[in-house]
């Protein structure tokens, strides 16, 4: 809204990004307690898995879920004020946010209604993810930059692969994988949102560099015209995420639920597609990939041998079972996530 006023100051990406971040963060702090209280009154409590860590059954009982509502409401309001709402990348990101959040909301709602940890059936969830990812990636393919179907590789300056139409299923795979990986990792207070903040910060830097022709030419990365609005979008997401972490830090007052985790993964996955950092995203999301692989390995090995590789999966529960405190697991995983982000960002220059 402010952008459309045409004020000169609002043409500066860094200014709008900074205030989109601050606006979303402060709004979260203001309305967060009211949303938490409202969810408690509605008895929208986190439904805990019986096969999870036993101490969670007592420690996390009664904590309201659907906290993704808080994140994305604050992000949306901030974007209305600070973003160019006519930008194609803004519209794609908004669609991904609302679509996957809606899917997660249905999942959370069914869990609460049935009072079990089984919400939306897996096949219906994946159908929804396929539909939303196909629409969003397809739109990106037809309205994106001239680089849209190109895959760029870290450490290699000039080598790239043009996937053509096959970029659509490739992009869909990234969105769906990211969405589900973030969902699996959301099991401890502050874990998933803290890692998301690290990735969001890294993608803001990448999006800013790709939006500037001078930086893009110097670093030998594609110049994505219009991607400056992605910087604003991610800035608002960063602020909303920090605001949510304020209440989600141990001991959590609210959980993001599938409403938050399914959408967060998809949003960051789409951001990586827009700025042509698909391969780089696999480094940025290293902790999420490791968490997902721990579940896959656990299931596959147990089916064949009836033995478990880990004491419990995903991996963060394994370390809890080894005696690590919840905060130790969370902070150490944050540190590892930050290291992955530093490695990913360093590859931009090392070409």
Curated annotation (Swiss-Prot):
Membrane topology term reads: Multi-pass membrane protein
Checking InterPro entries in the record gives: Glycosyl_transferase_4, PNAcMuramoyl-5peptid_Trfase, PNAcMuramoyl-5peptid_Trfase_CS
Please list the disulfide bridges. Answer: none
Top-level division of the source organism's lineage: Bacteria
| UniProtKB keywords | Cell cycle, Cell division, Cell inner membrane, Cell membrane, Cell shape, Cell wall biogenesis/degradation, Magnesium, Membrane, Metal-binding, Peptidoglycan synthesis, Transferase, Transmembrane, Transmembrane helix
| A Pfam family per the record | MraY_sig1
> CDD domains annotated for this entry?
GT_MraY (cd06852)
Q: Provide the GO MF annotations for this entry.
A: metal ion binding; phospho-N-acetylmuramoyl-pentapeptide-transferase activity; UDP-N-acetylmuramoyl-L-alanyl-D-glutamyl-meso-2,6-diaminopimelyl-D-alanyl-D-alanine:undecaprenyl-phosphate transferase activity
Any one Gene Ontology BP term? peptidoglycan biosynthetic process
Q: Where in the cell is it found?
A: Cell inner membrane
Q: Per the database entry, which stretches of residues form a coiled coil?
A: none
EC class: transferase
**What is this protein for, i.e. what is its function?**
Catalyzes the initial step of the lipid cycle reactions in the biosynthesis of the cell wall peptidoglycan: transfers peptidoglycan precursor phospho-MurNAc-pentapeptide from UDP-MurNAc-pentapeptide onto the lipid carrier undecaprenyl phosphate, yielding undecaprenyl-pyrophosphoryl-MurNAc-pentapeptide, known as lipid I.
**HAMAP family tied to this protein:** MraY
Q: Which NCBIfam families match?
A: mraY
What is this protein called in UniProt? Phospho-N-acetylmuramoyl-pentapeptide-transferase
Q: Give the originating organism.
A: Borrelia garinii subsp. bavariensis (strain ATCC BAA-2496 / DSM 23469 / PBi) (Borreliella bavariensis)
